Amino acid sequence: KPPRFTMLLSKLVPKKGKANTEFCSQYYAYKDLTKSMKRRLSSLRGVYSSDGPISITTKERVKEKGKKIKELKSTHKIIRRISSNYAIYSSPGHLVGFQPKIKNTIDLKKKLFKHQIKKKFQHSLEWEKNQLAIWDNRSMLHQATPFKGNRIMHRITIL
């Protein structure tokens, strides 16, 4: 079962406009898919790996601890129903394949990722001290933007 919600509380942040968190709504991304793409993705499960193409967190932990972390793998539906809405539930950083296996896996992954992060689905949160953000992990992609300086955040994830 995927984690449901994440809460992030900022305690120390760089200057406003630096160290933002970028969010992409996967409800809107799903709604904007063509009917044929909705059908295609609904018939597939994603194969995910903690050693995926942009597993930055894993690489940082290995660097800190000096030892390899065991790879975690999972599969789940790419299109997920949440209450009465549908969302794309796929992590560009960890998707490594599809079940059943398909031709042109790389092409479909690229097309899906490009669609998921379209500007019209995005919001950039400019952190201020003691600000709280809460989001649904099942329907929202998120990533920190690169920055210089220090940032202290307290994070809680609800399973």
Language-model features: where?
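Non-heme Fe(II) oxygenase catalytic core, chiefly the N-lobe of the double-stranded beta-helix
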Residues: 1-129, 137-159
